């Protein structure tokens, strides 16, 4: 489902600037966050590059919106999803992720996210699972180059001519 592009008419004027400013609203996926399209796209790229094999378990150090999106995308694509997180991660979040079909492995609370990442990396190596490592994975920006950027340019075009001068994105 294409994501809407809206013009933020009052923002530039309020800042005393000229031009036009648009926002790409990537919320049409099942979790309602921009992470849905990223998780699906990264899984597709990993499979295309034969880094992710059919039915291969996926492991990731995450507990937020990307974890939710990955749990759904992985299950839909036929991959078990295992999430690593510190043992003191919020119980309600863990329960939600379990209901989405993910499995959870805990790392020591005192090691924080670094401990969860180390557990994911070690487990992937030992068991032959695919470690997504989404924030450091080149498939993340590649997905946006292939899909998000062209979608924005196409949406903000007139008579086949792009009206886009600059694209600014948030990271994280």
What are these regions (language model features)?
Residues 1-172:
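PLP-dependent amino-acid enzyme catalytic core
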